[in-house]
Amino acid sequence: MSEHLSKAQVKWVRSLQQKKNRDAEGVFVAEGAKCINELRGAFELLLLASPDNASAIEIEQMSSLRTPQGQIAVFRKPTTDNRYPISQLMLALDGVQDPGNLGTIIRTCDWFGIHDILCSRDTADCYNPKVVQATMGALARVRVHYVDLPKALAELKDKHVAIYGTLLEGRNMYEEGAIPNKSEGVIIMGNEGNGISEEVRGLVSHPLLIPSYPAGEATSESLNVGIATAIVLAEFRR
């Protein structure tokens, strides 16, 4: 039986639900045995709360979930120098705001072997507890870089990296030749309501369209960004 958590430790974990406190401490919180076990091999574990050292009430107090998962862990955030190999397929997120969408996208990238995601500064925090929960441990294998996105994309474009963007005026991505090289480049996915920003849109070298079906008939105005990401990545990996 491990030593029972102190009131100060319980209060500390609760405080980490706020981004400013996570940033100040350089830590993040994960919940649930499966997610925690996935992350333990990739991040330094600082604290683990479980029925062995915390009461059900204390776990509920520390949890950010409606239904606590029984275990809560605090991990140290990785130090990142925002360097990444350019000879690979990467994803870029331009202002994706919803934590659930971001978590799903990170998990989808893990499934399709995307190891690096470039995020604009206004994209949701990948260490938000809701994001961490939605990734189901994928953060152990997918690196998330918060960058000046227009600048980063411009530098990649100068190095002759293909910049793909999902746009309504884009080319049907299933057409032959729409994607010259499926193994390299950057795919940009935009904000839930506004899509890709004007500044970033100007850097797209290969605009792509996910066609609706049947062609020419009225459909929903747009796809959820998480679903759209999965559709695009599936085509790139096909």
Model-derived features: positions:
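Short, basic, low-complexity termini and linkers enriched in Ser/Thr/Gly/Pro
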Residues: P78-S87, I179, S183
